Amino acid sequence: MSRPYDSMEPKVMDDDMLKAAVGEQGPQEEAGQLAKQEGILFKDVLSLQLDFQNILRIDNLWQFENLKKLQLNNNIIERIEGLTNLIHLVWLDLSFNNIEAIEGLDTLVNLEDLSLSNNRISKVDSLDALVKLQVLSLGNNQISNMMNIIYLRRFPCLRTLSLAGNPVSEAEEYKMFIYAYLSDLVYLDFRRVDEQMREMAKMKHQYSIDELKHREAQLQMKLEEEQAKQEKLEEHKMAFVEHLNGPFLFDSMYSEDVEGNKLSYLPGVRELLEAYKDKFVIICLNIFEYGLNQQEKRKVELDTFNECIQEAILENQDQGKLKVAKFEEKHLLNLNAIREETDLSNIEKKLTECTESIGELFNTLMILEMQLVEQLEETINIFERNITDLVGLFIENVQSLIAQCRDLENHHHEKLLEIAINTLEKILKGEMDEDLPDDVRALFVDKDTIVNAVGASHDIHLLKIDNREDELVTGINSWCAHLVDKIHKDEIMRNRKRVKEINQFVDHMQSELDNLECGDIID
């Protein structure tokens, strides 16, 4: 799909291009001048227009994390990429490019309007994550298979579709097929769907649609079951007790234990293993239930902390707003009085009073902020102690339970070794009545061989138990450290932001006063 500007030199989406685009589309006049002076942060941009730029590759958009509308039409883009961070995107135009495949849209879960018309796309897929999609423009591509239409049934919000100019749109059954299989569609190829035609299409394809709905219902049920399992697993991971609500840890001990599996053929070992497994799983379940209980306590502690923090911040903000409101009321009266004053000495006196007033406001707001910092610091320190104590208690009790698992393993090891030695003696004396597999009998050549085999099995089991303990302890300690670190960093950022706001407000007040002095009075 060659375009006149394809012969131009391809451009790179670098910072200069993005800054220029943001500047051109930003606020104008006084607001625009202020924005240019202070600089517009990419994360604050909601809409970005980059059409007709001869862009070959999408890049450097990761900072536009709050972008809602992106226009990249009429370029020479060959691949959909570089959009991963734009999770708030609602509207995306990639029409009139050289795109051959739909890809790179998995994180755009809020996208409602997508235009891919006038490209080289031959297959409709890789849109599964776009659950809010309402408008899809795919006109003038290379789509030829009617099955692409059935794929679009997974988008419950889809109301507008454009496929005109594709080979598929030339099929005799094109419209009837779409009317039947996309029953909620309102507009097709820029025309409203004819309701009579829709009903006729439904009747014609009724049997096929019923079969398809049945398959979709079964698939949906499986997906919901898998989703529920995954959600439960995530809950268990948050509690650091995943896969401890059953025989998973015990089974993992034997999954790589070649010698242990051979030894299970010895007389009496099966019964020994069953009893061992039952007791081991009970301890794992105790760890699991205790972990969920402690996770709930940590959640309550964190929720209470966040509520206290927000309450303190809001109360402080209300006090600050009250001080500012009183200041602004008085300041406005003073400004009006200065404008009406004709005596120069009185004007200078009032200007001095206004400047002092601004200074007093600054001091008041900064004192409020310092008080808040101290209050929040105390709250954070209390929370840090509480959450650290909860984590420490959790680790201590879990380690005690895991020690019981080791005791069971040690006891099992002793019993297994006893059975193995007795079996060796029977084999050497020719008193072994039971048949054993050849690879098992090969272990009983001498005492050292069988003792080493039992010991190797025991070492594997202890290693699995130790690794699971390390995983749990490391996991919750890391979580606690990262949480506390983030809380401290967030508070530092909040404080810096607030101090900056106070300084900017005070500077603005002083600038307004200075402009009044230099303008209204001297003139």
Curated annotation (Swiss-Prot):
Residues 166-204 form the LRRCT domain. InterPro entries: Cilia_flagella_integrity, Leu-rich_rpt, Leu-rich_rpt_typical-subtyp, LRR_dom_sf. Residues 204-242, 333-393 form a coiled coil. The keyword Transmembrane does not apply. PROSITE patterns: LRR (PS51450). LRR repeats lie at residues 44-65, 66-87, 88-109, 110-131, 132-153. SMART domains: LRR_SD22, LRR_TYP. Its main location: cytoplasm. Gene3D superfamilies: Ribonuclease Inhibitor. Keywords: Cell projection, Cilium, Coiled coil, Cytoplasm, Cytoskeleton, Flagellum, Leucine-rich repeat, Repeat. It is found in: Cytoplasm, Cytoskeleton, Cilium axoneme; Cell projection, Cilium; Cytoplasm, Cytoskeleton, Flagellum axoneme; Cell projection, Cilium, Flagellum. GO terms for cellular component: axoneme; sperm flagellum. Component of the nexin-dynein regulatory complex (N-DRC) a key regulator of ciliary/flagellar motility which maintains the alignment and integrity of the distal axoneme and regulates microtubule sliding in motile axonemes. Component of the nexin-dynein regulatory complex (N-DRC). Interacts with DRC1. Interacts with TCTE1/DRC5. Interacts with DRC7. Belongs to the DRC3 family. This is Dynein regulatory complex subunit 3. The gene is Drc3.
